[in-house]
UniProtKB/Swiss-Prot annotation:
Coiled coil: none annotated. Binds 1 heme b (iron(II)-protoporphyrin IX) group per molecule. It comes from Salmonella typhimurium (strain LT2 / SGSC1412 / ATCC 700720). InterPro entries: Cyt_b562, Cyt_c/b562. This is Soluble cytochrome b562. The gene is cybC.
């Protein structure tokens, strides 16, 4: 009886642990989405920089996660490598927009941030 109870507890902790992990990825996606809206609407350099900085942190954190669609894949699988590569692209695009924002080029930074949507759409089709 005791072994059965321990086995049930171990399995349930794994199940609930992965659900929490998926929520972290979802939270990061929400942060990216919410701040992309700020980037699109703002004309304020400080607000733009803050939104891009939050997006960068969320992208780096999300890159460490495994999307539900890839839970059965090994961490070094081609699919997981491609998933992470998508975040490398995204972070590079955010860095480019952030550089422009830091130079005071708000319009150019916002235009550069448009590429974020293309990257998002491409990788959502694959892994969402």
């Amino acid at each position: 009886m005791r072994k059965s109870l321990l086995a049930i507890l171990a399995v349930s902790s794994l199940v609930f642990g992965s659900a929490v992990f998926a929520a972290d990825l979802e939270d990061n996606m929400d942060i990216l989405n919410d701040n992309l809206k700020v980037v699109e609407k703002t004309d304020s350099a400080p607000e733009l920089k803050a939104a891009l900085t939050k997006m960068r942190a969320a992208a780096l954190d999300a890159q460490k996660a495994t999307p539900p669609k890839l839970e059965d894949k090994a961490p070094d699988s081609p699919e997981m490598k491609d998933f992470r590569h998508g975040f490398d692209i995204l972070v590079g695009q955010i860095d480019g927009a952030l550089k422009l924002a830091n130079e005071g080029n708000v319009k150019e930074a916002k235009a550069a941030a448009e590429a974020l949507k293309t990257t998002r759409n491409t990788y959502h089709k694959k892994y969402r």
